[in-house]
Amino acid sequence: MVVGVVFGLLALTFTGLVLVGALIKSSRDSVSVSPVAIPTFTPPERSTERPTERPGDGRSDEPEPRTSQPSAEPSENSQPRRTLNTSLKNNSLYANRGLPRVNCPAGSGSIYNHSQLKSLILKTSRCMDKVWSKTLQDRGITWHRPGYAITSRRGRGACGDFPQTGSIVPYYCPRNTTIYASTTAMARGSGNALGYGQITDWHGAIISMMAHEYGHHVQQLSGLSNTWWQQTLESGSRSGKLALSRRFELQATCFGGMFMRAAAASYPVTPARRNTLYYFYSRVGDHPGWPRDHGSPANNNRWFRQGYEKNKTFQCNTWLAPSSTTS
């Protein structure tokens, strides 16, 4: 989830509007349900700067420290730096062979236990580091680990409250490249918003959502997010801005699918659990009456499966896909 885009009144100061999707009523349900969100991303306040402020005002966990890998100064014998393509359709990120397998056993933690779920989120984040750092650095893209602020209830970070009122979603804040999440909100819900546990209590679903958030970090590092945001600012219509948002979010979902495939053998994601993930992504997406900013449940399922089954970044190029697949 990206926090701070107000599509009705697009602002240069990004007040926190959490973009939500929905839990679609199944045929066996006889009552309507409240939206269940799929995560999104918050655009940077300035595309060329990363503010140094730390998230939190004492109510949230401090973000887990990041480890950076500074670029070495070029020497006489070093290879010239690559010229990176930061466009949406031909980004340098797309020229890779996919994510390598990673040893990432999850264990049997419960999504309803804060300590267990937080531990699993941070453990699997290290697995995401391993596969994405190699993929990015192989393309000449500078990588650093995102920060994490995981609470049991609510907190406040550099992009505002998390989760926001009436929301359950984790989000990525590019102002300090930190991922924020409330374990209780994600698992059990908040207010009228149902938790992911209403769909499945298997922890792999929430970890796949955190992989979506990491996908936003990948978009940030590769220049995709800045290019997307510039095009959003230049778009002259609400429908145009929403169309860009859907492609952006569905791409992050595809990247999340890539990670789950990379970890599948060790996590493990059995064929039955794979089907659980497919079912999960067929139940989240844009809900009637809410902004069409994340894509339909059918297309969320489509792009998660695309990432999981193809495991190639160019296969996640939503910017070249037909509009029918990003609606």
What are these regions (language model features)?
Residues 1-11:
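N-terminal export and membrane-targeting signals
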Residues 132, 181, 208-223, 252-253:
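Active-site recognition of the HExxH zinc-binding catalytic motif
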Residues 220-246:
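Post-HEXXH active-site segment of zinc metalloproteases
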Residues 283-327:
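Pan-zinc metallopeptidase signature
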Residues 123-183:
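Auxiliary, metal-adjacent structural segments of Zn-dependent hydrolase domains
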Residues 19-111, 238-239:
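N-terminal low-complexity, Pro/Thr-rich disordered segments
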Residues 190-209, 242-244:
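Short pre-active-site segment immediately N-terminal to the catalytic Zn-binding motif
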Residues 236-264:
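Post-HExxH zinc-binding segment in Zn-dependent metallohydrolases
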